[in-house]
């Protein structure tokens, strides 16, 4: 009887593509208007002066200048702002 037993199936073998999240421009770096500063899920970083928020919570520069990261308020939230160069 030269039979081979059937191989089992697996429920693994899938993975999603990486979303390339994180800080794209660090503190002290010069940026131009429209530059992406942070890609994030939710408000890990909050927008400060001259920083806009996209519909996917991406933070971007509204004007040219220098990136500044700081902690603000009683909750010590992380905030990103653009300082005029």
From Swiss-Prot:
Cysteine pairs bridged by disulfides in the record: none
Keyword vocabulary terms for this entry: Ribonucleoprotein, Ribosomal protein
Database matches in Pfam families: Ribosomal_L27
One GO cellular component term: cytosolic large ribosomal subunit
GO biological process: translation
Transmembrane feature ranges: none
Positions of the UniProt region annotated as Disordered: 1-27
Ribonucleoprotein is among the record's keywords: yes
GO function terms (MF aspect): structural constituent of ribosome
Gene3D superfamilies: 2.40.50.100
Homology family: Belongs to the bacterial ribosomal protein bL27 family.
Annotated protein name in UniProt: Large ribosomal subunit protein bL27
């Amino acid at each position: 009887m030269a039979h081979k037993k059937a191989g089992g199936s697996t429920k693994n073998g899938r993975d999603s593509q990486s979303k390339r999240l994180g800080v794209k421009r660090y503190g002290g770096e010069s940026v131009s208007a429209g530059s992406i500063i942070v890609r994030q899920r939710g408000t890990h970083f909050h927008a400060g002066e001259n920083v806009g928020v996209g519909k996917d919570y991406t933070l971007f520069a509204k004007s040219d200048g220098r990136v500044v990261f700081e902690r603000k308020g009683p909750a010590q939230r992380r905030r990103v702002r653009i300082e005029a160069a």
